[in-house]
């Protein structure tokens, strides 16, 4: 690489998809019924699995937050289930959504309508269930499930189709640098998106530590704030533009809806 000097810097490298944090996943991804729409090349394989599964068990996973587009893990389940329902196969398929979180969705107002679709598709939701290992050849997925007292039990679940959402972390060159906060993400003032210790550095998008959902809609709003505040800092003016935490995550719950 090469070193480039700067007077001001905007940091927005995105988020790292940490496939390696799930034992055995990388070796079996894209075969043995294991897929992920977070890997764009595998979207056709997801569709292939959905179309060809006539019976059995379909597992869908969601890792601990933060992740990019927090609704995407559910979208895969809803759209697959809608296809099976429309083609009269759903009654022979056991659909299960394993989420490492304690709630179905982070915005409480949306949980009741989403639960209606969970019921419509006869899906089972398992909370505090984190995928930690995949044995592709055996078609077994292992989950660490935490109870209300914090005790963790590892459970093996057989599958015919497994849609995985990988854990997501800041890139190493951020998390291991002085620019990171305790979580490893790029530290910012959540209003100005300026680094609290390096006044000439700003950040936006999935890598920054602002508490909003990590979505393209959030980045679209953040870039305006960063541009205005960067110019203000350059000219010695007060940073008057403030990010309000806006984010959006469209949730597709059936074909065309």
Predicted regions and their residues:
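Short, solvent-exposed loop/turn segments at secondary-structure boundaries
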Residues: 69-73, 106-109, 213-217
């Amino acid at each position: 690489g090469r070193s480039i000097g700067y007077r001001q810097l905007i940091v927005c490298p995105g988020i790292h998809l940490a496939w390696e944090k799930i034992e055995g996943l990388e070796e079996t991804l894209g075969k043995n019924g294991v897929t992920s729409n977070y890997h764009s090349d595998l979207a056709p394989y997801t569709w292939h699995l959905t179309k060809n599964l006539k019976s059995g068990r379909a597992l869908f996973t969601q890792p601990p937050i933060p992740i990019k587009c927090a609704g995407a893990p559910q979208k895969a389940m809803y759209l697959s289930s809608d296809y099976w329902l429309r083609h009269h196969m759903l009654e022979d398929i056991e659909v299960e959504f394993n989420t490492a979180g304690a709630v179905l969705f982070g915005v409480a107002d949306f949980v009741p309508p989403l639960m209606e679709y969970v019921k419509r598709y006869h899906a089972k939701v398992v909370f505090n269930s984190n995928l930690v290992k995949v044995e592709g050849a055996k078609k077994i997925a292992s989950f660490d499930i935490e109870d209300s007292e914090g005790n963790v039990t590892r459970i093996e679940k057989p599958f015919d189709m497994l849609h995985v959402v990988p854990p997501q972390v800041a890139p190493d060159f951020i998390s291991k640098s002085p620019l990171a906060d305790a979580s490893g993400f790029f530290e910012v003032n959540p209003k100005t998106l300026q680094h609290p210790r390096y006044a000439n550095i700003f950040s936006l998008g999935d890598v920054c530590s602002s508490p909003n959902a990590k979505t393209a809609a959030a980045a679209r709003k953040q870039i305006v704030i960063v541009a205005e505040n960067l110019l203000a800092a350059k000219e010695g003016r007060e940073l008057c533009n403030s990010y309000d935490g806006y984010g959006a995550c469209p949730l597709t719950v059936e074909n065309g809806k």
